[in-house]
Every structure is written in structure tokens, then in C-alpha cells.
């Protein structure tokens, strides 16, 4: 009594086309194939034998009828289960070999084991053993172009055996070979059958078919003759030749991803120019984004550095309703009483008045226009001026109305050239003024046309400019006090003191916050423009990946035939696009650093400030672009039907 068939077909029908163009290629095929048989399916071109082979190897599906594998209905299996069936049970030997041209013989044979998650060392060892067993021990590292037709077909057979090859489906395996190579391949297939493999041989040549124990003849999509089931079936040894697979799912998944990454790298470096051109848009886009962020950060830091010269947590008090008030010049209520009152407030760290007047300054026979500022000794610390030489004027100088002054570095160069100003006496009007210190030129004074000189404000009032009120009072809020609350308290205090609000305030903290918001907005606007180039680069990646899918359609078909699941193909192309984009991102960052160095070499007004966050944004953007724009080509690749993909040249 016969055992359960390994393969059983019941009333299988396969049609192509629709409506008037519909063609029935297979008509009510009924067939049983038992384990250990060597079956030849023979027929002329167009008889349906290749279509039948595709159905047997689950590369295609029937329109009607039932296909049972070991009694299990194939139509109930999911896409992944069908892939597992191809991976662990079927091995294909194609007429045109279908070897990947960029891989060596060993690497071609390894492919099925990648999808069965065999460990790398084991799959290399097994691939080498299979090739040696087939007489290719001297061609292990050869690529298909370096092999003869017979050698390529033996590599194809070794690949079919990689995961055990319980069933060998050979489609015209000798069609492209000379007579000697044909005999060698047939001998190998017969040997495999004697070892227990089920061999199904597809051919149009009855002489080739005669090597099989059972011959099935097809014509016009129907089986017209069957010599009958072989009585002395070879005991299957598939269990003996099937490699042991990992039982740990996460390790298997990791191996698949690792193999996909290596394949992606291989494809990138196999097409260096195309990869570089693909990455060019990403490189330019990432470099633009990083440079814009760095430039914005540098500009912000420069502005903040300049703004720090105005002091931290300072509040300026001016006469008038607001900036540009034409009546402000008539208001004379900011005076010594206000200054004394403000200095008594517990929430303030210090206060300094300011009187300014433009007067000629003379040294020897040289006269320059100067902005003369009357301030207190607390002014320099409050405004964070940096002393370069000499000293500040102090409380004693203030109390005794000393004619001492401090000038800035630019004024020193204008008046004294290369000489030091400290200890020199200049004349403002007819009053001799001793210079006791030199400070760094404040950023707001660098482009000014006048010399700048600071004197004790009471000296200015008593000796130079008789004025009883101040043009400005600046206070500094203590660190632990909220500036907004301090500003409100000052407004309330002076409004009560004056009997009305005839002044306005300017908070450095508010201005700083407004400045930061403006800088961030500008950076975002410019970055969004730069981001457009990233999108263009992403579209370039998608275009190239779409072309790559079309170019590699046959490769996709081969991978699916040897056991790749849809997700394996999807992941491989996604990894390729993400790798291209990430590498482009890295090169873009390097380019931005190079541009930053060149920028610094040509100008020192603004320095590009590169930050970790900008690099992080670059890598996130490049990887996301690779994933997003690579998804659609990858999905198209994963959805290709294997029988259609294999038919592409």
C-alpha cells in the first residue's frame, strides 16, 4: 500500500489574462508525487510544464483546484508559510542558472541559509562542502562570469541543497549546456535521487526524460500520459541533510538583519558612482541644515555676548512715555533722590545714573569729538566692562569730585596711537582730565565715530555740564528675584515718587528673551528652506531605489524562490536606502565641518557654533528620509510575485 503522497494535485486549473484574452494554461491537472521519486515532466514548448513546475514549487498559485503538500492544503497557507515551504523543502535548479553575478560561488550557495537563519560559520562551511562534493573545490571564490555553464549549474544545484533540498525542481537544467556538461548534471541529479531526494525534472527532450524513473507527458495544458509511480522508492534522507536551525527567534531575526545589512553594503560599494550621486542630495541637504543651525547658534552667541555688555538682570529707566517720545527732553524728574531711593531697595543689587554729553576732547595738538558719560563707580561692574590696563575710578574719586576718567581701547588707539593712555592728561573744554584706566571697547561702540570717555557723574555735573537730573538710571536686580516683579515694584515706587508715570523701563531679560525668540524663528525659517534640499535628496534616493528594484527584479525572484519572505525583501531594500541616507548624512556633517573651518578662515565676525543637537538632527533626518523615501520602492520589491520576477531578464 502506497504511503501518503508528498505532493498531490486535484483538478488544478491555471489561467492567464481576463475576458476575451483569457487563456487556460493548465486544465484539470491531477497528479501525485511520492517522496523519493525521480519524475520527468516532458512536453513541447507551450504545453504548460513550466507553469506546472512553478505551481509545484509554490512560486505561483492555481486559480482552481487543490494542492496538498503532505496532506496540507496549500491555499490555506500565509505568504510567510509559503516562503518557509520554499526555504526548507524545495530547491530550484533553473535553465539559466539564476546566480547573482556580484556574488562568489560560496556566497550564491549561502543565500537560502541566510533566510533559514543558519549561523554564518555553519552556512559557509556547508556551502563549501556542497561545492566540493560537486567537484567545485577550486572554484569556491569564483564569480558566475568566471565559471563555465556546467559549473554554474552545479553551483545552482548546491544552492538547491543548502537547506536540505527535500524536493529538487529542475527546469530544463541541461538546456544551456553542452552534451558532456548535460550528462554531468543529470548524473548529479540521479545521485541526489538515490540519496533520497525527490527530483522533478522539467524538459522538452524525451532523451533527457528517459533518465527519470517516471515520465509524465503534457500537451496543451493537460497530462496525456503517465508511466506510473515508481515501485522501489528511495527512502528520503532529507532529515539528514537539512541543517540544524536556531530555535531562538530573536537570534534568527538578528542574523537576517545582519545579512541584509551586509548585502546592502555590498550593493552600495558595487555601484560606487551611482551610490555617490544618490547620496549627493542628502549630503548637500544635511550640510545645509547643520551649517544653518551652526550659523544661527553662532549669531545668537555673538548677539548674547554683545548684549551681556549691557549687563545681566538690568533694568534701564528713561524719561518719557516710550522710545522716541518728543517730550522726554523736557522731563527732569530722574534725579539724586530717585537714585538714593532705588539704592535702598532690598531687591536691587546696585544702581548707577548716566549723564551724557558730546564735547571736544584735546590731547596736545590733536582734537577729537568725544561722547562724555557721567556714571557712578558701580557702572563698570554692572555693565560688565573688562579692564585692560590701569584702574577704575572709585568711591573716593566720586566723593571728592576728582577729574579722573576711563576710556575704551578704540579711543586710546585714536588719540594715543600705540602708546598707553593710562597716566595721560586730556582736556575736555578747559578742564584737564587724568586717564586712570582703559577698558575693552563695548560692542555697540566699535563702529562709532566718536571717542568714548567715562567720568564720575558728579564731576561732570560740577565741572563740565551743569545738570541736576539724569538721562538714565540703570539698576541691577538680585539673582534670586524675578525681574518682572522687580520691574513692577520700580514702576510703582517711582510713580508714587513723581506723582505720575513720566518714565519708562527697559528690561534686559525681556529683551534677551525676545531676541532669542527672534533668532530661533529666523533659524527655523532658514532651516526649513535648507530642509527642502533634504526632501529633494530623499526623492533622489526614492528614484534610484525604484530603478534598483526594476534592475534587480530577477534577483528578488531568486531570493524569493530560495525562501525569502516579503518582509526579508522589504527589510533589505529599506536597509539599503537607510544606509545610503545615513552615509550621506555622515558625509554631510563632515562637509559642514569643512565649510565651518573655511568660514572661520575668511571671517571672524561670526563663528559657526556646531552643537551635538545639530548633528543628532542631521542623523535623525537622514535616517528618516532613507526610511520614508525608501519604503515605497521596498514595498514594491516585496510585493513582486516570484514567478513574474524570475521571468525578467
Swiss-Prot record:
GO terms for cellular component: plasma membrane. It is an enzyme of class 7 (translocase). ATP binds at residues 43-50. It holds the Pfam family FtsX. This is Macrolide export ATP-binding/permease protein MacB. Its EC number is 7.6.2.-. It is a multi-pass membrane protein. SMART domains: AAA. It comes from Pasteurella multocida (strain Pm70). It comes from the Bacteria. GO terms for biological process: response to antibiotic. Keywords: Antibiotic resistance, ATP-binding, Cell inner membrane, Cell membrane, Membrane, Nucleotide-binding, Translocase, Transmembrane, Transmembrane helix, Transport. Its main location: membrane. It is found in: Cell inner membrane. The keyword Nuclease does not apply. GO terms for molecular function: ATP binding; ATP hydrolysis activity; transmembrane transporter activity. Part of the tripartite efflux system MacAB-TolC. MacB is a non-canonical ABC transporter that contains transmembrane domains (TMD), which form a pore in the inner membrane, and an ATP-binding domain (NBD), which is responsible for energy generation. Confers resistance against macrolides. Homodimer. Part of the tripartite efflux system MacAB-TolC, which is composed of an inner membrane transporter, MacB, a periplasmic membrane fusion protein, MacA, and an outer membrane component, TolC. The complex forms a large protein conduit and can translocate molecules across both the inner and outer membranes. Interacts with MacA.
